[in-house]
Amino acid sequence: MTKIYNIIITVFISSFVIASEWIGIDSVNPVRFEAKSLNSDIETSEVQFRLNGYTLTEIETPWGTQYKVETEGGSSIMDLGAPDLDQTFASVIIPDNAQMSLEVISSSYIEIENIDIAPSKGNFSRSISPSDVPFNRGDVYAEDQFYPGKLADLRDPYILRDFRGQTVVSYPFQYNPVSKVLRIYTNITVRLSSDGEGQKNVLARSSSLNKIDSEFNSIYQNQFINFEDNQTRFEYLVDQGNMLVICYDAFMGEMEPFVEWKNRKGIPTEMVSVSSIGSSSSAIENYVSDYYYDNGLTFLLLVGDIAQIPSPSISGSASDPSYGFI
């Protein structure tokens, strides 16, 4: 049955794909891949990736017409000289100080035979036109095995304010350039498990988490697929976030009505002058960090130009957002 299905798919592609076309598996219309939490107690989480279809795009290469395979919501692996395939992502909340291991617990796929997948041009600057970058086949094209080989992987842990998270990467497209077989994984289910003490981006809390700002509550819902699972284990009070205004001294009077209006709206707002903090960006960074840990902080507003409120320098450029990295 599988062989028959593969043949039907191959004929369908060669007959109907003209330039770029969505090929539905569970949906006739282009829809984003699905990533959902099957169950999670934070120490262990099971995540399912589902593919409802994919897009094949014809690309003219030095070796003739070949294809780029993509899915809605995915992004190219961008491995120079390797088959140009998409990868998909999902983030989960993990323990504050644990290292996580990953295992694939189930998967299913369909195959497309006799298909040429074009090589990736890699990652390059926006100042370079893609048409100016030549196609090159890497050593992968001489290897009789599926690329990229692994079905899933973990990125380094990160901290997003109240939680420590980790991104799960799935590779639903696997291509063997020698046999010219493309495997499309319609389902990849993985399990993350705590596996010893964490070494990277460990979250050290000064106190237990019992309140979440409403604005960040929405961010967490969109960022972490197991956030709702986490809420069932811990009861958090969703509260209004606060604002700190750092203002150039000469503008303080003009900003008073703004601060008063914010407080009337129910957003606790405090204004301080630059002169009371210090004239350097490091002094402002230290003040913001101390304020965050002492009072909590959701919004930071800087009132003044760079000559009046200095900015941290990142790679030689001013970077106001760096004040938010605590």
Where are the regions that the model predicts?
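Hydrophobic alpha-helical segments of integral membrane proteins
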Residues: 10, 18-19
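Sec-dependent signal peptide recognition
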Residues: 2-11
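Extracellular pro-sequences of secreted precursors
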Residues: 19-302
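Surface-exposed loop and adjacent secondary-structure segments within mature catalytic domains
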Residues: 297-326
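Intrinsic disorder/low-complexity signature
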Residues: 2-3, 210, 317
